[in-house]
Amino acid sequence: MKDLVKVLKSQAQSEEFDAIKITLASPDMIRSWSYGEVKKPETINYRTFKPERDGLFCAKIFGPVKDYECLCGKYKRMKHRGIICEKCGVEVTKAAVRRERMGHIELAAPVAHIWFLKSLPSRIGMFLDMTLRDIERVLYFESFMVIDPGMTTLERGQLLNDEQYFEALEEFGDDFDARMGAEAVQALLNDVDLDEEIERLREEIPQTNSETKIKKLSKRLKLLEAFQKSGNDPAWMIMEVLPVLPPDLRPLVPLDGGRFATSDLNDLYRRVINRNNRLKRLLDLNAPDIIVRNEKRMLQESVDALLDNGRRGRAITGSNKRPLKSLADMIKGKQGRFRQNLLGKRVDYSGRSVITVGPTLRLHQCGLPKKMALELFKPFIYSKLQAGGQASTIKAAKKMVERELPEVWDILADVIREHPVLLNRAPTLHRLGIQAFEPLLIEGKAIQLHPLVCAAYNADFDGDQMAVHVPLTLEAQLESRTLMMATNNVLSPANGEPIIVPSQDVVLGLYYMTREKIGAPGEGMVFSNLDEVERAFGTQSVSLHARVKVRLTEYDRDEDGGEWTSSTKIHDTTVGRALLYRILPKGMPFELVDQPMKKKAISGLINAVYRRSGLKDTVIFADQLMYTGFRLATWSGASIGVNDFVIPDSKKEIVDGAEEEVKEIENQFSSGLVTAGEKYNKVIDIWSKANDKVAKAMMAGISKETAIDREGNEVEQDSFNSVFIMADSGARGSAAQIRQLAGMRGLMAKPDGSIIETPITANFREGLNVLQYFISTHGARKGLADTALKTANSGYLTRRLVDVSQDLVITEEDCGTEDGLTLHPVIEGGDVIVSLAQRVLGRVVAQDVVDPATDDVLIARGTLLDEAWCARLDTMGVDEIVVRSAITCETAHGVCSACYGRDLARGHQVNVGEAVGVIAAQSIGEPGTQLTMRTFHIGGAASRASAVDSVQVKHGGTVRLHNIKHVERSDGKLVVVSRSSALAVADEHGREREYYKLPYGAELSVRDGDMVEAGTPVAKWDPHTHPVVAEVEGKVQFSDMEEGLTIHRSVDEMTGLSNIEVIESASRPASGRDKRPMIMLLDENGGHVTLPGSNTPVQYMLPGKAIISVENGGQVGVGEVIARIPVEASGNKDITGGLPRVADLFEARKPKEPAILAEVTGTISFGKETKGKRRLTITPEEGDPLEMLIPKWRQIGVFEGETVEKGEVISDGPSNPHDILRLLGVAELAKYITAEIQDVYRLQGVVIDDKHIEVIVRQMLRKVEITDSGDSSFITGDQVEFVRVLEENQRLAQEDKFPAKYDRLLLGITKASLATESFISAASFQETTRVLTEAAVTGKRDYLRGLKENVVVGRLVPAGTGLAHHAERRRRREDPESTANPSAFDVEQELGAQLTALDAEDDDL
């Protein structure tokens, strides 16, 4: 254990340490740091600018102002080093010691440290078991506190005001001791006997019954134990000596004109010293008590202000009314020490400039302006000039460079050769925001950037700037080249897809090149090889789009990368595709380019090349693609004019038709047939459908044209309309944008997100009238406002994500767990959105995958599923696979390689040392920013899906019904009477291809196991209401339904039928408030019908607004609808819901009105209602019934007598993740969070691999709550690291003791970051004061396991090459003898020597 201050003093930083501990400083320790006491408030003499003696800048205490020169000038120069001048008392040494030598102030009266007093919960208050207010009254001299009551009736710790104190003095004389101020508190703190008090609390806790009391006691117990364990003395929370910061860290700089710029700390220190000296004088003079008291109070306040200004009372302000910056402010916040200087530093050897396009560059190159290169590589050039003998001294070299002589440029070219530079564009949202390139010297002043890396940087050329950094050391250059070179980052770490993908012009060119035109010149020609095709095209005897026959040779290589085999055959293709085949790497099949190359196809092509031909070929190919694409886009001459936006002829009649329907509904509304809500929903549905129809008609018009083929027949082909080409290829624009240009703009949203009923029927080509323009401004302006706000939000989300996951690194190969998550394909409706193959790609199988039919092992556990395996999955008929996951990984610190699976950016199993936590955080955070920036691109056009009201099978197959209860209606249809049921359609392999959720009350026209054809309707329901279905038959009996009190009737004018509506309890007259309207069913004998299998009578409770469709005394058959409950209208989906939604999920916030889940499995019954709540009881098979109170306005989805499973939904709503974890377990929780977050991102078309989300969830599940401490050292109710509990339980198991029992906890990312083991990481994240206070009191140790802590203390991070460095360091320390393999430094020295020797030989030649 070494004192950190001493470690820092001994200039050699080679001191090895593995942990940093933070504790309270004892007065003696503060004195031991100090080089002398600061006695005077003076700073420097304003005439001579020399520091005053004994003042805040005193040279005697803090060291000389100039290097090796004492203050009076008697000793100068190095030869007197270490001498202390007898005249001025200054030690002759480096002036840098003024940055590290501390002083101290001996306080005349003890002072409480404000952090331990006011940082909540107050540590002093908790320790003494007093309220903060009481302690403050004592400290600030308002009341006396009894320290020692003696034989009197007073109690220890009792507060007395002045009157009471004097009364007590009269009554008891001096039998008792009462004081005020910090001395009193210090005396009390000294009196507490820790061991005894802890013993007392440990006995008291089990005997208390009240929850709050137990919480309070265990908190106090924890604090006392912390003091006991850490060896802190509680009295040290009161300070007797104040340390003084070294003067160069609070500088005083003379400005011209005799004024000084000073650090606020000097003012604060001056205040303290002034008051302290005055207090000393008053004490010497034996001044009256009241004056001394006042002075002590002022001293306390001035020390408070110095430590944390503004925490108590008003902040002390300087001359300009600005609060002074105290010590606490120096370390916290964005401008504080942690974030400004320790985690983010400015670096030298860097420059920045505007970027322009470099379409002629290779992927690994960037164009660097000569001027910049000269400046950046100056030192290298100087040394080269000197070594080459062109310049004798550095000064001469400098002159040559300044004059820019020709030989300088030659040397620059030499220096720059193969020396990578790093290019960075702010904001750096993921690791691809910094990449390495080899510089090419260019004229001009702008950096040239390769177009293909723009996607990774999110750069465009409208004035963006980029920064250049030069890696200096050999290791840095090596890492830049092997890890950061643009050519080594072809795949995105977020999803494993290529990120070096052509966009815009290139896509347009390649698409244009590979399109076919019927009847093009030269159609039907036959060519013997590619050269002939090229010649024919070059002489314009054949069109680029003509369909021709070409003889091509394809190569193939067998699996092990052995011999090439070739096959030559004639392909029927187009000229453009044949030409494109020329640049495809050897061994790629022709069919990859034998299609119109849209953006998706190009991405797939690059992916295929990467998987089959490796990195090098991919990079060369990507470059070739780019050159080809640019050339052909230019050559195609694609351009757009207003006439390219073709408005469909059918638009008018579609719009008119929709208007008719809307009129019809308006009429129904005005005659009272539909409610306003229903009208709104229906109108919006009508317009959504009309908009889609217009869009379809318009796309059909734009996308097809008729052409005359060689036989002279008219045929239809894809059109060559430029707008269509651009959208179809994915170069620019989307169907949604074309719809607004040439279809109709459609429904618009108000700024609050609700949709305006009247749509904009015009489009941009026709032009908008004033009203339409006005309506559309709403959405557009909201989009712009959102963008500005969301960027900040998204950046903050990323910061929290990085903070929670930064210490997660791959630390071992395999933890050996059998656990994992079960993955299924994601199916929404009739479409497989994410196939099983996509989900398990790059994962390791946790349990053997077995063929359900034959019990053969299809895939053994421990297999890493690559593309080849996943291709075979489709035919295996497997519906789920258990794969390893970061969440179930059992590695203590970090994750193991097998649980993580494939490194997405490299395409092989992840290496030990990869910082997967940070990668995950960046992968999730980066698109967040992108998304938020993309709200307004569709200009607020309301994209609202029409309500789903039926299920039609898309592909044929077998129907499977999942967890369903249904009753058969008299007409033979089945009616669903269960909640979370679903209908799936399985194909011939038995794999489910379609999956539909079925709501309660849906009518099914098929049964389980039926075969259905594609297109068959299988289920239907009313989306706007929630029905109540009779599960048994009987005669209706109304209960508590009184006209005007609980129900009112209204007669439908069109049909003459009357319907009954239940009045909401709030709007009922007082006498009807407590009534519970319900419907009972009677049998023939007039007895109550009971549910089958129980003796509970059937009763259907009806909530407010329910519309009853039966009459009292009427007959009801099985499966018939008794009543309908209207469903509220839904809002508009936009990422505005998206980003906050992601934040809510990661913060594990409880939603406002969460779904209510069944806590146990059992039967439902309703009890007596209370005011505003309903009582619902679940009775399990064995055990006590469980009562739940549910607010009346919640729609309860279960009926009396139903049986529910643990964790089933009782009342609908957004799920509460904490409930899912508690009732359903970790795997379900992981599934829920992953699915929810993926939904948000998928809506925006962003692909993120599940494993990134799992990594974050793992970090959120780090803590557990102890439910029973067993024989462990934990306290019940404590939150402890999961790993700690596992270690402790393992130890207890070996000793045959009772292990601790615990519940897993889900913490939000902010909470999890603050609850991390490392206090350095937590303090640099948020709430610095609180974190440090707590860490100091408990004497926390930081073992520097994460990345952040190591950056802060200035070491290599324990990830990547740093992991090896730290392992090596530990090994060296454990056996110092074996330095068998040399350090990187030695190797570099040796290499350098050899290279120099070689260079010398070259020069001789």
Curated annotation (Swiss-Prot):
One Pfam family here: RNA_pol_Rpb1_5
InterPro entries to which the protein is assigned, alphabetical: DNA-dir_RpoC_beta_prime, DNA-dir_RpoC_beta_prime_bact, RNA_pol_asu, RNA_pol_N, RNA_pol_Rpb1_1, RNA_pol_Rpb1_3, RNA_pol_Rpb1_3_sf, RNA_pol_Rpb1_4
Cofactor: Mg(2+); Zn(2+)
Keyword Transferase carried by entry: yes
EC number per UniProt: 2.7.7.6
Cofactor remark: Binds 1 Mg(2+) ion per subunit.
Residues engaged in binding Mg(2+): D460, D462, D464
Keywords, in A-Z order: DNA-directed RNA polymerase, Magnesium, Metal-binding, Nucleotidyltransferase, Transcription, Transferase, Zinc
Binding site for Zn(2+) 1: C70, C72, C85, C88
UniProt GO molecular function: DNA binding; DNA-directed RNA polymerase activity; magnesium ion binding; zinc ion binding
Positions of region (Disordered): 1363-1388
GO cellular component, one term: DNA-directed RNA polymerase complex
Catalyzed chemical reaction(s): RNA(n) + a ribonucleoside 5'-triphosphate = RNA(n+1) + diphosphate
Matches recorded under SUPFAM superfamilies: beta and beta-prime subunits of DNA dependent RNA-polymerase
Subunit structure: The RNAP catalytic core consists of 2 alpha, 1 beta, 1 beta' and 1 omega subunit. When a sigma factor is associated with the core the holoenzyme is formed, which can initiate transcription.
HAMAP family noted in UniProt: RNApol_bact_RpoC
Descriptive protein name: DNA-directed RNA polymerase subunit beta'
Organism of provenance: Chromohalobacter salexigens (strain ATCC BAA-138 / DSM 3043 / CIP 106854 / NCIMB 13768 / 1H11)
